[in-house]
Amino acid sequence: MYIKQVIIQGFRSYRDQTIVDPFSSKHNVIVGRNGSGKSNFFYAIQFVLSDEFSHLRPEQRLALLHEGTGPRVISAFVEIIFDNSDNRLPIDKEEVSLRRVIGAKKDQYFLDKKMVTKNDVMNLLESAGFSRSNPYYIVKQGKINQMATAPDSQRLKLLREVAGTRVYDERKEESISLMKETEGKREKINELLKYIEERLHTLEEEKEELAQYQKWDKMRRALEYTIYNQELNETRAKLDELSAKRETSGEKSRQLRDAQQDARDKMEDIERQVRELKTKISAMKEEKEQLSAERQEQIKQRTKLELKAKDLQDELAGNSEQRKRLLKERQKLLEKIEEKQKELAETEPKFNSVKEKEERGIARLAQATQERTDLYAKQGRGSQFTSKEERDKWIKKELKSLDQAINDKKRQIAAIHKDLEDTEANKEKNLEQYNKLDQDLNEVKARVEELDRKYYEVKNKKDELQSERNYLWREENAEQQALAAKREDLEKKQQLLRAATGKAILNGIDSINKVLDHFRRKGINQHVQNGYHGIVMNNFECEPAFYTCVEVTAGNRLFYHIVDSDEVSTKILMEFNKMNLPGEVTFLPLNKLDVRDTAYPETNDAIPMISKLRYNPRFDKAFKHVFGKTLICRSMEVSTQLARAFTMDCITLEGDQVSHRGALTGGYYDTRKSRLELQKDVRKAEEELGELEAKLNENLRRNIERINNEIDQLMNQMQQIETQQRKFKASRDSILSEMKMLKEKRQQSEKTFMPKQRSLQSLEASLHAMESTRESLKAELGTDLLSQLSLEDQKRVDALNDEIRQLQQENRQLLNERIKLEGIITRVETYLNENLRKRLDQVEQELNELRETEGGTVLTATTSELEAINKRVKDTMARSEDLDNSIDKTEAGIKELQKSMERWKNMEKEHMDAINHDTKELEKMTNRQGMLLKKKEECMKKIRELGSLPQEAFEKYQTLSLKQLFRKLEQCNTELKKYSHVNKKALDQFVNFSEQKEKLIKRQEELDRGYKSIMELMNVLELRKYEAIQLTFKQVSKNFSEVFQKLVPGGKATLVMKKRRXERQSGLRMKEKGVVKGERGSGPQSSVPSVDQFTGVGIRVSFTGKQGEMREMQQLSGGQKSLVALALIFAIQKCDPAPFYLFDEIDQALDAQHRKAVSDMIMELAVHAQFITTTFRPELLESADKFYGVKFRNKVSHIDVITAEMAKDFVEDDTTHG
C-alpha cells in the first residue's frame, strides 16, 4: 500500500485544483524554493491523515483556506488516492480515495465519495498499520532539531508512546475511578448496616404487644365485614328491583321515541316533498317567463314578417303594372325604330348615288385641274430652264419624288382598306359575343332563382330546429333546478354526516382523496390508486335494525381505510406528509391482517355480527378484524353469559355492550345521529343525483347537442348558398357590364366607319392626280424645250378649261343635293341612336331589374315563415296555459302537504311531552339508583379496606343480627383502645429491615470482590506496561545501534534507560490523583515492577567506535545531534513500520557524507515502504525514483513531475525556476 496520487484545491497556497502525477511506490523527492509550497503539500497530507488537525475551530479552518488575489475561496479539499493492491486497507478495491473537505462551517470526510466520520477514518488507518502511538511516519521541518535537543525525559515519553502505554494508562485511570466509586459504596453500606442492627433490636421488644393487638383487631375486622356485607346485599336487592323498573320504563321510552322518530321521518318526507314541489313551481314559473319572453319575440318576428309579406305583395303588384307599361313602351320604340330604319333605308341609296356621282365629279375635276396645271407648268418650264438637259434632270427628280409619294398614298389606302375590313370582322365577332353573353345571362338568372328558393327552405328548417332547441333548453333548465335541489339535499345529508364524525377523521378522509387526486392528475402510482378501497363504512351494507349495534361495535373503525397492502398505505402516507396535509388516518392493509376463524356458539339467542353484513369477499379479512369477535344477543343477560363463556364481545340491538374482559357499556343511543343511517341516506341521494345527471346527459343534452349540430350544419349550408348567390349575382353583373361594353364598342365602330370611307376616297383621288402628273412628266421627258405650248396642247388646255367649268357647276349641284340627303340621314340616325335605341336599352334594363320571378320566391318563403311563426306562437300559448294549470295544481298539493305537516307536528309534540314525563320519572329512578350505587361502592370500599381476612371471618358471625354484631363490635373497640400506643407496623418493619440487612450484606460482598478484581487488573496493567516499555526499549535500542552503524560506519551508539536512585519497589504505588489503598486491598505487590522507576532515555554515541570516546547528546555538535536524531527516528520506524513516510528537509543540518548515508538508508528502506521527501541537497536525489518540482507564481503553488536533471538544477540554483 502507498500514496498513489494527491489532489489539492483551495488549501493554503494551492488555490486551483492541483492533481499531482502518480507517485512512485519507492522514493519520491520534492524540490522547490523556500516558500514555494513544499511544506504546505506535506501539511495537506498530514491534514487528511494526522490527529493534529482533528479538532479545528472556525478561525483555524479559515486559516487553512487559500488567501490571494481574485475571489475568496470558501471551501477547500485534499484527496489522497491509495494504491491498495496488497489489500492492506480492508476494502476490496485496488484504489481507495480518502478526501477531507473544510469550509467556514463544515469539516467532512469522504471515503470513495461516501461521507464517513473521523473515527471511521482513524480506525481504517490503524487497520492498515498507522499507529496512533507512533506519529513519526510524518516528520515535519524542525522535528529533527527538536528531537536532537530534547531532554532524556522527553525521549522516555516518546518511547512510552511507541510502546503504546497510553492504552494502559487510560485503562488504569478507568480502574482508579471505579475503585473510588466502589469505596464510597462500601462506606454507605457499612453505615446502613449499623442503623438496621439498631432498629431490629428495638422492633423485637414491640412484637409481643403487637400480637395481642392483632387478635382483637382480627375480630373487629370480621365483625365489620359481616355488617358491611349485610348492607351490601340489601343494597343489591334494591338495585335489582330498580333495574327491572328502569327496563320497563326504558322499553316504553323506546316505543315513544320510535313513534316520535316516525313522526319526524314523516315530517322530513313532507318537507322534502314540499321543497321538491316548490322547486317544481319555481321551474315552471321560470319556464313561463321564458315562454312569455319567447312569445313576445315571436310576435315581433310575426309582425315583421307580415309587414315584409305586404311590402313584397305591393312590390309585386307595382312591378306587374310597371312591366306592362315598359313592355308597351318597348313595343312603340321598336315600331318607331323600324319606321326610322325604313326611312333611312329609302334615303341611303339616293345619298349613296349622289355621293358616288359627286366623288366621280370631284375626282374628274381634280384630274382635269391637275392636267391643266401640268400643261401650264410645261409652258412655264421654257422660261424656267435654259436647256433641255436641265429640264430633263429636274423632271427625273420630280418623277422620283412622285413615285415615292404615290407609294406612300398606296400604303395609306391599303391600311385604310385593312382597317375597314377589320372593323367589319370585329362587328360580326362583337355580335356573336353579345348573343353568347345574353344566353349566359339567362342561365345565371335561373341559377340565382333556384338558390333563393333553396336558401329559404334551409332557413325555415333552421327556424324549426331553433324552436325545438328552445323547448329542450326549457326542459334542461327544469332538470337543472331539480338537480340543484337534489344536490342541496345531498350536501345537507353530507353535512349531517360530517357533524356526526370527528374533525380529524374528516380531514384525514379529505386529505387521502387529495393524495389520490394528485396521483391521478400526475398519472403516477396506478397500483396505489387501484389498491385503495375507501373507508370501512362505504364497503358494506346491513339491515337498518342492526345499524345501532354495528355502529357501536365499530366506533371510529368505520372510518378506517382499506388498502391491499402496507406498501400502498406507505406510499399514500409519504405523499400525505410531503403535501403537509391535516387529519388522522388509520389503514387496514389486507396483506398484514392476521385473522383466524372463530368458533361461534350455537344458540338461538345470539348470532355473529359479521353474518349480517354484506360486503365484497376480498375484504373478508378487514371485516373479520373489525366485527369477527362480536355477537348480537337478544338481551343483556344473554350478552353477559356468552361474553363470560366464550370470551367474545357481545352487544344487543339497542347498543348495550358486554366486553369479553367484563366491562359493560350502554344507555340511550340517538338513532337520529346514526352514521350508518346518514351514510345510507347520502349514498341513496348520490345514486338519485347520478341518475338525474345521467338522464340529463343521456337525453336532453344529447338531443340539444344533436340539434346544435344540425343547426350548425344548416347555418353552414345557408352560408354556402349565400356565397353561391353572391358569386352568381356578381357573375350576372359582370355579364351585363360586358354586354354593355360590347354594345358601346359596336356603336363606336359604326361611328368611325363613314369618316374612314371618305378618307379613302380622298386618298384615291389624290393618287389619280399624282399618277396623271407622273404620266405628263414622263411624256415631256426628252421633248424639245419650248417657251410656248404646242397647238395641240393649247387646244387641250382650252378643252380642259371648258370641262373644269362644267364639272364645277355639276359638283356644286351634287354637293347641295348630298348635303340635303346627308342631313336627313344624320337626323334620322341621331334620333335612332341617341333617342330611340338608348331609351330601348333603358327599358330593357328596367325590365331585367324587375325580376318578377325572384320577388315571387321571396314572397313564398316569407309566407311559409309566417305560417311557421304563427304555429310556434300558438304552441307557446298552449304550453303557457298548461303551466298555469300545473302551477295551480302543485300549489294545491303544497297546501295539502302543509296541513299534513301540522298534524304530524302535533303528534310529534304529544310524543315529546310523553317522553319528557317519562324522562323525569327515569331521572328520579336514576338519582335513587345513583344513591344506592354510591352506598354499594362505600360498602365494597369498606370491605376492601378491611384487608385480607381469615376464612372463618366470612362464616363465624353470619347468624347474628345487626344489633348483636354492633354490640360485639363495641366490645372489640374498647379492648383495642388499650393498645392504642402499639406500633401497628412493628412486625412488617422487622421483616422489612431483616430483608434489607440480607441484601446489603450480599451487596457488600459483591463490592469486595469487585475491589479485589480491580486491584488485580491494575497490577496486570502495570506489569504489561512495564514489559511493553522494556520490550520496545530493547527493539529500539538494537535498531538504533544498527542504524547508527550504517549511517556512521565504524561508529557506535547505545540507548541507556535511566532510573531513580535508591528506588525500591514495594508493591503497587497509587499516587495518581491522590488515591490510596483501601482497607480491603490486596496488600503489597512486590513482584510487580513500576514504570515510575524510569526517569529518561539517554543516548551515548561514539563516531570513532572507541569505547572511551562515548559521549552524551549535550557533548555533540549540531550536525551530529541531527544524525543521532535521524538514527533514532529510523530505529523507531523499524520497530513500528508504516506503509509510507513523509520527511520534510530531514537532511538540513547534515554534512554531505552523512546526507549520503541517510540517502542510502532511505534507498534500503524504500524496498518495503514508500518515501516522500523534500530536500535542498543533491544527495537525496541519487536514491530517488521520481522527482517533483514546486513553483510559486502569483501567490499560488503548482507541483509538477520533473526530471532528475531539473531536480538537480532546483537544488543547485533554485532561482532559475523561481
Curated annotation (Swiss-Prot):
Gene3D superfamilies: 1.10.287.1490, 1.20.1060.20, 3.30.70.1620, P-loop containing nucleotide triphosphate hydrolases
Annotated region described as Disordered, given as residue ranges: 242-268, 1067-1089
Any one GO cellular component localisation term in the record: nuclear matrix
Post-translational modification: Phosphorylated at Ser-1082 in a SPO11-dependent manner. Acetylation at Lys-105 and Lys-106 by ESCO1 is important for genome stability and S phase sister chromatid cohesion. Regulated by DSCC1, it is required for processive DNA synthesis, coupling sister chromatid cohesion establishment during S phase to DNA replication. Deacetylation by HDAC8, regulates release of the cohesin complex from chromatin.
Binding site for ATP: G32, R33, N34, G35, S36, G37, K38, S39
Keywords: Acetylation, ATP-binding, Cell cycle, Cell division, Centromere, Chromosome, Coiled coil, DNA damage, DNA repair, Meiosis, Mitosis, Nucleotide-binding, Nucleus, Phosphoprotein, Ubl conjugation
Start and end residues of each SMC hinge domain: 530-642
Keyword set includes DNA damage: yes
Modified residues (Phosphoserine): S787, S886, S1013
Coiled-coil features, chain-numbered ranges: 179-350, 393-503, 669-916, 958-989
GO annotation terms (biological process): cell division; DNA repair; meiotic cell cycle; mitotic sister chromatid cohesion; regulation of DNA replication
Sites of Phosphothreonine modification: T783
Basic and acidic residues bias spans: 1067-1080
GO molecular function, one term: ATP binding
Stored SUPFAM superfamilies: P-loop containing nucleoside triphosphate hydrolases (SSF52540), Smc hinge domain (SSF75553)
Cell compartment(s), UniProt: Nucleus; Chromosome; Chromosome, Centromere
PTM sites of type N6-acetyllysine: K105, K106, K140, K1191
Family assignment from sequence similarity: Belongs to the SMC family. SMC3 subfamily.
Domain description: The flexible SMC hinge domain, which separates the large intramolecular coiled coil regions, allows the heterotypic interaction with the corresponding domain of SMC1A or SMC1B, forming a V-shaped heterodimer. The two heads of the heterodimer are then connected by different ends of the cleavable RAD21 protein, forming a ring structure.
Purpose: Central component of cohesin, a complex required for chromosome cohesion during the cell cycle. The cohesin complex may form a large proteinaceous ring within which sister chromatids can be trapped. At anaphase, the complex is cleaved and dissociates from chromatin, allowing sister chromatids to segregate. Cohesion is coupled to DNA replication and is involved in DNA repair. The cohesin complex also plays an important role in spindle pole assembly during mitosis and in chromosomes movement.
Subunit structure: Forms a heterodimer with SMC1A or SMC1B in cohesin complexes. Cohesin complexes are composed of the SMC1 (SMC1A or meiosis-specific SMC1B) and SMC3 heterodimer attached via their SMC hinge domain, RAD21 which link them, and one STAG protein (STAG1, STAG2 or STAG3), which interacts with RAD21. Also found in meiosis-specific cohesin complexes. Found in a complex with SMC1A, CDCA5 and RAD21, PDS5A/SCC-112 and PDS5B/APRIN. Interacts with MXI1, MXD3 and MXD4.
Protein name as it appears in the record: Structural maintenance of chromosomes protein 3
Originating species: Bos taurus
